[in-house]
UniProtKB/Swiss-Prot annotation:
This is ABC transporter G family member 53. Residues 504-717, 1174-1388 form the ABC transmembrane type-2 domain. It comes from the Eukaryota. Residues 153-426, 849-1101 form the ABC transporter domain. The keyword Protein biosynthesis does not apply. GO terms for cellular component: membrane. It comes from Oryza sativa subsp. japonica. May be a general defense protein. The lineage of its organism: Eukaryota, Viridiplantae, Streptophyta, Embryophyta, Tracheophyta.
């Protein structure tokens, strides 16, 4: 057998290798049994089929067509009608999964085929990380530079390594057996993810691993573990533009789904020998899944059915800015993507996040059926498994603080803990008990010896006790006897690295790249439109009626036109940076899981986009060539076309390489600007070859722009139009123009240039492939930890007990290091079981909210319209009514897609699109969003926070802006401390928040922060969207304790919630239950032990009674599911609306919809809690912290500035002192032009992703009415000013001195002045472009056009005096033109020295450029004005536009 697919009932893939001959179940999971009687015709066809040779029999099947006809078909060559009939017939496979698996197993057993199995052993496994301890680990600018220098010194063995070792897994051992389901449990930071990664052979490179892991006795270097096992990550990384079906289908193609040929041949051969007739539906499924073009589609359809994804199969996955499937559906896509792999062992990390308990149960049950029937191996980590889900598992692994506390059969786990003095209470879920019993804070409540004094039992004692327990002894005895390798099935372990042929992998990537191009077509259409606009501008600026072939000066203008064309084509590739980096996280995941080699990914990204290059170059060349007046020769036209085409491919390859090397948007933008700078400076146009310093001449020879400039210039100036002489010269004019610009005047340089550029195309794409092959993601998670937490971890390893200290501080990256903060939390002052009202002492007004007949609809999606639906709108909420009251905790529940989050968004006023109908009142008064936002809080499902501030700073910022202005800072600080105590965040107060899934806080810590951010606002009504999603049982209990405490203060709290445990569910007072389609089916009290809820549903005919000890929430979701409605013929919505409960609720709504006597409507004297000045100060404070701790932006910017300054200084060394001729002046001006262009573009492009990330946080904070848009914009603008000042000083001092401009105070400070405000307006322009566009990628593309236009009209490529009169107006609105005006005039506008020809420099500046010295102060005002204008437009765009669609 070759598949994890079997393992999950989802499909396998038997390789066509000799070792696979005996394998067998791969197709297993996708077929449904049919008990239909065979008629005579079918019997005759089968008789004929059995006479065929094995080879033909494996490809031929009997297919029932929709009209009833039985047709003998070759599954490798199906027509469209037959293909459709086959897929329709097999659509039922997922509905009877266990029966299908049993039929398959019976079939292989009958012919004696043995299915392969894997036993995984791990012995003395240790995993360590290295981390900086304390504040040194924070990513500040100074720490970043210090770390780089220290790392270099460590490499050279100059200084010792100051990082401390952190133990993640400590000496763990165990056995994971086939045919058994293993549940992995443990508190946050226990090391669960690291253990799963280690067992799957996918440990991050930064970790040190020792010990041994074997599969069937084979060490990991004897086979390919990443194909023999499948690892399902807890992070949902997908390409948002693809649909669910396309995402899973791509994985199926890459992982070898459909390669079941060997199994099929062996089955057919043995069945023919023994005259066995297989089940016809199992037979056709196996054949369809093993051969033919539909094989991956068959497998994909089955997986989608089993995981309940068939209802959203054709919906795009979506991302932060692209609306797609729900979070729970996305989690299932992550599972589906991996369970089609050929691995026989499954390691699944937190696959239930965002799923309701019934969905989790169904998925785990499907996996269990596969494991038990076909013999797979599975370890699944779950956060809050319901008791019925827990019962599906055979074995338990309990980890705590990197040590195995228990590993063995589920039925003995409670026996073990009772042997050490701890007992699980009767109504406590065993999984919840196991999560909490090793925790210092929660352990005491489970102590069973009331007559003995309790003492805390550390993890080490549990681990040692387990070694003495009979289960631990049995494991140790079994590990002492090595696994007999001869028992390992030859098909169990994979030795080939990839699951499909290179041709198939390349085709899969090509198909996906074409799909992505279609979905991102807006970007490419926009680029083409933008290029067309630039073409129009260029041909009207360099129009032939104004340009002549009669002088060297005019030749220089033509040279500028050619140079501008090359620049436009080169800048056109800049958008590749953003598009490439956006896809890298998914690529790295798929590369590490061996979906495909890097070259099959990089090649399509190059080849498939070549037609776009053809289109872009065609637009440019064929529109501009004759209008500008280039040499009218068709051959030279096509030569220019060929050259620019190759140049476009070079540019795209260069920027893809930069993106692949940098792997970070800001760093890549900086590197891209740097490369453009080097290539342009040394390309021969800005600085001619004769003027390039000897120490930089090598750069001239390696610049792609040099070869392009030489080739395109030779092609033009050796043409007929320039083959004329002018007075005073014997050589042709074209050759004179070439020589004046330092270009080689020989025809061969055209082909030299084309050849060199083709070489660069290959080189850059090869380098890009190499980067993708060998480099890891940019954020290679470097964990940091506080000294106190490190001591606690070390104490847990040694069994010591340390005293609690006043405050713990942790900064941890759970994704890599799994640092445990559990004990650090427990060391802090204990939170009582009901500290509730403490910490909620600030006064507030209790408020109720009622809503009646709420309807919400959206425009009908095009995908659904394409299926024949004629309605213009899709209704998501259908007349919902209810009320939420003070002091009452309400659970908003329903299966995925029921509309829970939609209803909450509507009530909270968070919807930005769609159509809302119905009435909402707040304590009897109509809801007004402006005032409602002041008294309400909203905890979003996605925990959105500024990544570069600490936990305490996040809370301080929220409290500062949302609490009333009359509350003084001391009271506010006290309140923040109390809220942190309430949600147990005090030990994490100095932890950096970080980015989800990348750095900083763990999922559950981030969730508690989200709640705390709302609590510090002291709201009357709080909405919480899945506050326990992604948390383990203990963390969920902490969160629920905080929520319960909040409710007990008299607040109104509503929570959507998935898969709650019995404890959590019964902590709610009322339940608002919805069914799929947006209708309520129960709105009422939960009752003691859920008695009210159970009584209501059990009174409905056809509803099964709840079993003793069963989770009421799980039972409720099961009995009200759509499937049960169909089975029982019950419409729960109609029953509810005809019930007494509904009438009581309507009466309550009516009562609460009338204002109480003596009450008044909500009103506030001001729109926001704080004054405008306070809002500005708060926003500036947060931005200052964010910038200081964002070294990829700030530290890289300064490093880039220093490097660029040194490059400019050495390239233009001393040109400021040379004034012999006009070329000397042009060289000096070139240094100014290049510095303005490149430093400015770098500032603009690097600030865009920073603003884009913060804008997502801004949307949440603005919706909460924390501040108005203007203070946010002012804070973002103001924080840049000091950083730009430092940048200007660094650059200005270095460059001014090295270039050798005149050392007078006035000229020096004028130079600094213009550089400072130029960098400012470029930076503010970058911010503005993000504010005006929906995403960073669009902003990047739009900006490229403006950079090009500013470049053209700057006055360097073509001076103002030569710009056509109809375009001269734009010169005056081009900010770069004003900058160059100011720089040149301030340095040379008053110089009375003369050139060699006797012309005074100041006169030449005035006559040639049109620069007047007495206009300098006006120029200065204009440059400042542009900075102010762009900053103002950024603020205006932030205020007006909201691109977040909800």
């Amino acid at each position: 057998m070759d598949d994890a697919g079997e393992i999950h009932a989802l499909g396998g893939s038997l390789r066509r290798e000799a070792s696979s001959a005996r394998s067998g179940d791969a197709a297993v999971f996708f077929s449904r049994s049919s008990s239909r009687d065979e008629d005579d015709e079918e019997a005759l066809r089968w008789a004929a089929l059995e006479k065929l040779p094995t080879y033909d029999r494996a490809r031929t099947a009997v297919l029932a067509m929709p009209e009833g006809e039985l047709r003998e078909v070759n599954v490798q060559r199906l027509g469209p009608q037959e293909r459709h009939a086959l897929l329709q017939r097999l659509a039922w496979v997922g509905d009877d999964h266990a029966r299908f698996l049993s039929k398959f197993k019976d079939r292989v057993d009958r012919v004696g085929i043995e299915l392969p199995t894997i036993e995984v052993r791990y012995e003395n496994l240790n995993v360590e990380a290295e981390a900086y301890v304390g504040s040194r680990g924070l990513p500040t600018i100074l720490n970043t530079y210090a770390n780089v220098l220290e790392g270099l010194a460590n490499t050279l063995h100059i200084t010792p390594n100051r990082k401390q070792k952190i133990s993640i897994l400590h000496n763990v051992s165990g056995i994971i057996k086939p045919h058994r389901m293993t549940l992995l449990l443990g508190p946050p930071g226990a090391g669960k993810t690291t253990l799963l990664l280690a067992l799957a052979g996918n440990v991050p490179s930064g970790l040190k691993v020792s010990g041994q892991i074997t599969y069937n006795g084979h060490t990991m270097d004897e086979f390919e573990p990443r194909r023999s096992a499948a690892y399902v990550s807890q992070h949902d990384l997908h390409m948002g533009e693809l649909t669910v079906r396309e995402t899973v289908n791509f994985s199926a193609k890459c992982q070898g789904i459909g390669h079941r040929y060997d199994l099929l041949m062996e089955l057919s051969r043995r069945e023919k020998e023994e005259n066995i007739k297989p089940d016809p539906e199992v037979d056709i499924y196996l054949k369809a899944a093993a051969t033919g073009e539909q094989k991956a589609e068959v497998v994909t359809n089955h997986i989608l059915k089993v995981l309940g994804l068939d209802i959203c199969a054709d919906t795009i996955v979506g991302n932060n800015m692209l609306r797609g499937i729900s979070g729970g559906q996305k989690k299932r896509v992550t599972t589906a993507e991996m369970i089609v792999t050929p691995g026989r062992a499954l390691f699944m990390d937190e696959i239930s996040t965002g799923l309701d308990s019934s969905t989790t149960y169904n998925i785990v049950d499907s996996i269990r059926q596969t494991i038990h029937i076909v013999g797979g191996t599975a370890v699944i980590a779950l956060l809050q498994p319901a008791p019925e889900t827990y019962e599906l598992f055979d074995d338990i692994i309990l980890l705590s603080d990197g040590q195995v506390v228990y590993n063995g059969p589920r039925e003995h786990v409670l026996e073990f803990f009772e042997s050490v003095g701890f007992k699980c209470p009767e109504r406590k879920g065993v999984a919840d008990f196991l999560q909490e019993v090793t925790s210092r804070k929660d352990q005491r409540q489970y102590w069973m010896h009331g007559d003995e004094t309790y003492r805390y039992v550390p993890v080490k004692e549990f681990a040692e006790a387990f070694q003495s327990f009979h289960v631990g002894q049995a494991i140790r005895s079994e590990l002492a006897i090595p696994f007999d390798k001869s028992r390992s099935h030859p098909a169990a372990l994979k030795t080939s690295k990839y699951g499909a042929s290179m041709k198939e992998l390349l085709k899969a990537n090509i198909d996906r790249e074409i799909l992505l191009m279609k979905r991102n077509s807006f970007v490419y259409i926009f680029k083409a439109t933008q290029l067309t606009l630039m073409t129009f501008i260029a041909m009207t600026v360099f129009i032939r009626t104004n340009m002549h072939h009669d002088s060297i000066t005019n030749g220089g203008i033509y040279m500028g036109a050619l140079f501008f064309g090359i620049l436009m084509i080169m800048f056109n590739g800049l958008a590749e940076v953003g598009l490439t980096i956006a896809k890298l996280p998914v690529f790295f995941k798929q590369r590490d899981l061996l979906f495909y080699p890097a070259w099959t990914y990089s090649l399509p990204s190059w080849i498939i986009k070549t037609p776009l290059s053809l289109l872009n170059v065609t637009i440019w060349v064929f529109i501009t060539y004759y209008v500008i007046g280039f040499d009218p020769n068709v051959e030279r036209l096509f030569r220019q076309f060929l050259l620019l085409l190759v140049m476009n491919e070079t540019s795209s390859g260069l920027f893809r390489f930069i993106a692949g090397f940098a792997r970070h948007q800001v760093v890549a933008s900086t590197m891209g600007s740097f490369c453009i700078l080097i290539f342009m400076l040394l390309g021969g146009f800005i600085l001619s070859r004769e003027n390039v310093k000897k120490w930089w001449i090598w750069g001239y020879w390696i610049s792609p722009l040099m070869y392009a400039q030489n080739a395109i210039s030779v092609n033009e100036f050796l043409g007929h139009s320039w083959n004329k002489t002018i007075p005073g010269f014997r050589e042709p004019l074209g050759k004179l123009v070439l020589e004046s610009r330092g270009v080689f005047p020989e025809a061969k340089w055209y082909w030299i240039g084309v050849g060199a550029l083709l070489g660069y195309v290959l080189l850059f794409n090869i380098l890009y492939t190499i980067c993708l092959t060998f480099l890891n993601p940019f954020d290679s998670n470097q964990p940091t930890i506080s000294e106190e937490t490190l001591k606690i971890k070390q104490a847990n390893l040694t069994g010591d007990v340390i005293e609690a200290s006043s405050r713990g501080r942790i900064t941890t990256n759970t994704n890599t290091a799994d640092d445990s903060n559990d004990e650090a939390i427990s060391n802090h002052a204990t939170v009582n079981s009901s500290p509730g009202k403490k910490g909620m002492v600030l006064p507030f007004v209790p408020l109720s909210i009622t809503f009646e007949d709420i309807r919400y609809s959206v425009d009908m999606p095009e995908v659904i319209k394409a299926q024949g639906v004629t309605e213009s709108r899709l209704e998501l909420l259908k007349g919902i009514s209810g009320s939420f009251r003070p002091g009452v905790l309400t659970a908003l529940m329903g299966v995925s897609g029921a509309g829970k989050t939609t209803l909450m968004d509507v009530l909270a006023g968070r919807k930005t699109s769609g159509y809302i109908e119905g009435n909402i009142t707040i304590s009897g008064y109509p809801k007004k969003q402006e005032t409602f936002a002041r008294v309400s809080g909203y905890c979003e499902q996605n925990d959105i926070h500024s990544p570069n501030v600490t936990v305490y700073e996040s809370l301080a910022f929220s409290a500062w802006l949302r609490l009333p202005a009359e509350i003084d800072s001391a009271t506010r600080k006290m309140f923040i401390d109390e809220v942190m105590e309430l949600v147990e965040l005090s030990p994490l107060k100095d932890s950096l928040v970080g980015l989800p899934g990348v750095s900083g806080l763990s999922t559950e810590q981030r969730k508690r922060l989200t709640i705390a951010v709302e609590l510090v606002a002291n709201p009357s009504i709080i909405f919480m969207d899945e506050p326990t999603s992604g948390l383990d049982a203990r963390a969920a209990a902490i969160v629920m304790r905080a929520i319960r405490n909040t409710v007990d203060t008299g607040r109104t709290v509503v929570c959507t919630i998935h898969q709650p445990s019995i404890d959590i569910f019964e902590s709610f007072d009322e339940l608002f239950l919805m069914k799929r389609g947006g209708e309520e089916i129960y709105v009422g009290p939960v009752g003691q032990h859920s008695c009210e809820l159970i009584r209501y549903f059990e009174s409905i005919e056809g509803v099964s009674k709840i079993k003793h000890g069963y989770n009421p929430s799980t039972w409720m979701l099961e009995v009200t599911s759509t499937v049960q409605e169909q089975i029982t013929g019950v419409n729960f919505s109609e029953i509810y609306k005809n019930s007494e409960l509904y009438r009581r609720n309507k009466s309550m709504i009516k009562e609460l919809s009338s204002p109480p006597d003596g009450s008044s409507d909500l009103s506030f004297p001001t729109e926001y809690s704080q004054t405008f000045i306070t809002q500005c100060l708060a926003c500036l404070w947060k931005q200052s912290l964010s910038y200081w701790r964002n070294p990829p932006y700030t530290a890289v910017k300064y490093f880039y500035t220093i490097v660029i300054a040194l490059l400019f200084g050495t390239m233009f060394w001393g040109v400021g002192r040379k004034r012999s001729n006009q070329q000397d002046l042009f060289n000096a001006m070139g240094s100014m032009y290049a510095s303005v262009l490149f430093m400015g573009v770098q500032n603009s492009s690097s600030v865009q992703p920073v603003v884009s990330v913060e804008r997502t946080v801004f949307y949440r904070e603005r919706a909460a009415h924390m501040y108005s848009p203007l203070p946010y914009a002012l804070g973002q603008v103001a924080i840049e000013l000091p950083y730009i000042l430092v940048q200007s000083l660094i650059y200005g001092v270095l460059v001014y001195a090295m270039i050798g401009f005149e050392w007078t105070a006035a000229k020096f400070f004028w130079y600094l002045f213009f550089m400072y405000f130029t960098l400012s307006y470029y930076t503010f322009y970058g911010m503005m472009s993000v504010g005006l566009t929906p995403s960073y990628n669009v902003a990047s593309v739009v900006s490229t056009a403006f950079y090009a236009i500013w470049n053209l009209f700057s006055g360097f490529i073509i001076p103002r005096t030569r710009i056509p009169i109809w375009w001269r107006w734009y010169y005056w609105v081009c900010p770069v033109a004003w900058t160059l005006y100011g720089l040149v005039t301030s340095q040379f506008g008053d110089v009375t020295d003369t050139f060699d020809n006797g012309v005074r420099i100041s006169d030449f500046v005035e006559s040639y450029f049109g620069y007047h010295r007495d206009f300098l102060w006006v120029v200065a005002v204009m440059v400042v004005s542009f900075a102010v204008l762009f900053a103002f437009l950024f603020g205006l765009s932030i205020k007006i536009f909201n691109f977040q669609k909800r």
